[in-house]
């Protein structure tokens, strides 16, 4: 009943109005799985390749017809008759057929969409929710947890058209007892932040991930207005709500000069100087997690940053590790960072994603499941977070349906699992247990 009988790909639209790949996998017995590939804006140079057509007369060159040719042609042919429940084999067939290191022949967007659709079809054939199937694929059947959200309520960098250099300023509702309560707390802070920004004459338009995108006097002011919003919502900063940042520092790094240029506030830093700047912020605000605090190639700088902050807070590698076990192993071996951001499409298949999560956990690193800035209504990452008991999730702010879809799926899963999926809050964050 779990043999693949048909694979279909189509071009749909993501949250930025760009095309992306959606795939359907059909099994014997009428079971169907459907999934869509997300797309990043600030991307690591070592990510698996997202295949775009380059035809400027169509979607400004961002069409995905070439990727769809792979889905509807060689991938579909190769997977006919295969057992969808054997996810590792399905993924390996596509990887081998592509034959490149970075999936550049078919595109990671093509392979990933089919990989996730296959998992959904297999879950349907087994008569179980996707998170339960993922837990079985992960070798941890029945082991679940609800993730602590990192909610990106001020957007900057590549995610917004403003003067804020640091890409994401996030809140974590650590005082919540359940995921549903955490979502409520986040929503209340989000609405109070709108009031705080309006009172200061700031814009309340939102960026790619649903957070506000005002022009501010400095990056530190973003933390200050969030602190005001937390208080206005009736919560205590550092107890009920903690803070996290994604610097996406590769986006403001000058490789020739080896400098970090915060143009929005007219400040330039050396590598160690920028780490010291971040360390100073952690003394002024309850920041418990910093992601991509340096350029992806600045491994010496990351060694310094990890030595300075790695015993105190969570140091997350996103562009640094790109969900790639080879690169993550180098980081583990050299004591670089202490956490990895997990993005399906950086590596391009569910099997490889699960391998990265396992490697991180085995080494004592945390794994933070993440969306991309270009998303769809597909909420698979919610099931991934619960099914791997990863403990943390980044899926944007409290606006835009492409973000809220993931929170709503988490609420449904928590309702279904109850006490079987504990919400551990701050204990999930490295160095905060």
Curated annotation (Swiss-Prot):
Q: What InterPro entries does the record tag this protein with?
A: Enolase, Enolase-like_C_sf, Enolase-like_N, Enolase_C, Enolase_CS, Enolase_N
Its UniProt pathway annotation is: Carbohydrate degradation; glycolysis; pyruvate from D-glyceraldehyde 3-phosphate: step 4/5
Q: Which CDD domains match?
A: enolase (cd03313)
A single Gene Ontology biological process assigned to it is: glycolytic process
A GO cellular component annotated for this chain's UniProt record is: cell surface
Q: Which reaction does it catalyse?
A: (2R)-2-phosphoglycerate = phosphoenolpyruvate + H2O
Q: Which residues form a coiled coil?
A: none
- The first-level EC class reads lyase
- Cofactor binding comment, as recorded: Binds a second Mg(2+) ion via substrate during catalysis.
The places in or outside the cell where this protein is found are: Cytoplasm; Secreted; Cell surface
Active site feature: 209 (proton donor), 343 (proton acceptor)
Q: Which residues bind Mg(2+)?
A: 246, 291, 318
Principal location: cytoplasm
Q: What is the E.C. number? A: 4.2.1.11
Q: Name one GO molecular function term.
A: phosphopyruvate hydratase activity
Q: Where does (2R)-2-phosphoglycerate bind?
A: 167, 343, 372-373, 394
Output the SMART domains linked to this UniProt entry: Enolase_C, Enolase_N
**NCBIfam families to which the protein is assigned, alphabetical:** eno (TIGR01060)
Subunit architecture: Component of the RNA degradosome, a multiprotein complex involved in RNA processing and mRNA degradation.
Family as reported in the entry's similarity comment:
Belongs to the enolase family.
Name assigned to this protein? Enolase
Give the organism, scientific name.
Aeromonas hydrophila subsp. hydrophila (strain ATCC 7966 / DSM 30187 / BCRC 13018 / CCUG 14551 / JCM 1027 / KCTC 2358 / NCIMB 9240 / NCTC 8049)
**Gene encoding this polypeptide?**
eno
């Amino acid at each position: 009943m779990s043999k693949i009988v048909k694979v279909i790909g189509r071009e749909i639209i993501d949250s930025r109005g760009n095309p992306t790949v959606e795939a359907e996998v059909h099994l014997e017995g009428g079971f169907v799985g459907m999934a869509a590939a997300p797309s990043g804006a600030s991307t690591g140079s070592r990510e698996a390749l997202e295949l775009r057509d380059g035809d400027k007369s169509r979607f400004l060159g961002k069409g995905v017809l070439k990727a769809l040719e792979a889905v509807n042609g060689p991938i579909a042919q190769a997977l006919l008759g295969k057992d969808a429940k054997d996810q590792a084999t399905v993924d390996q067939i596509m990887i081998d057929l592509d034959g490149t290191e970075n999936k550049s022949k078919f595109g990671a967007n093509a392979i990933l969409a089919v990989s996730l659709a296959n998992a959904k079809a297999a879950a349907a054939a087994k008569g179980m929710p996707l998170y339960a199937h993922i837990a079985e694929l992960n070798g941890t059947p029945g082991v679940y947890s609800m993730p602590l959200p990192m909610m990106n309520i001020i957007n900057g960098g590549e995610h917004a058209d403003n003067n804020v250099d640091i890409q994401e300023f996030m809140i974590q509702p650590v005082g919540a007892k359940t995921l549903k309560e955490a979502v409520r707390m986040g929503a209340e802070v989000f609405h109070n932040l709108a009031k705080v920004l309006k009172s200061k004459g700031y814009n309340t338009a939102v960026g790619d991930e649903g957070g506000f995108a005002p022009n501010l006097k400095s990056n530190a002011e973003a933390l200050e207005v969030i602190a005001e919003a937390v208080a206005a919502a009736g919560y205590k900063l550092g107890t009920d709500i903690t803070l996290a940042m994604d610097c996406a520092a590769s986006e403001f790094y000058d490789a020739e000069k080896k400098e970090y240029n915060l143009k929005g506030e007219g400040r330039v830093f050396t590598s160690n100087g920028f780490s010291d700047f971040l360390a100073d912020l952690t003394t002024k605000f309850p920041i418990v997690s910093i992601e991509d605090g340096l350029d992806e190639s600045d491994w010496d700088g990351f060694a310094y940053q990890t030595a300075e902050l790695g015993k105190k807070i969570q140091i997350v590698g996103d562009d640094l590790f790109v969900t790639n076990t080879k690169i993550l192993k180098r980081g583990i071996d050299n004591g670089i960072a202490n956490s990895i951001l997990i993005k399906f499409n950086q590596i391009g298949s569910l099997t490889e994603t699960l391998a990265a999560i396992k490697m991180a956990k085995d080494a004592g690193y945390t794994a933070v499941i993440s969306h991309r800035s270009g998303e769809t209504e597909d909420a698979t990452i919610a099931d991934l977070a619960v099914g791997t008991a990863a403990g943390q999730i980044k899926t944007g702010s409290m606006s835009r349906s492409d973000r809220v879809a993931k929170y709503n799926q988490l609420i449904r899963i928590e309702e279904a699992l109850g006490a079987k999926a504990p919400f551990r809050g701050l204990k999930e964050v490295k160095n905060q247990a």
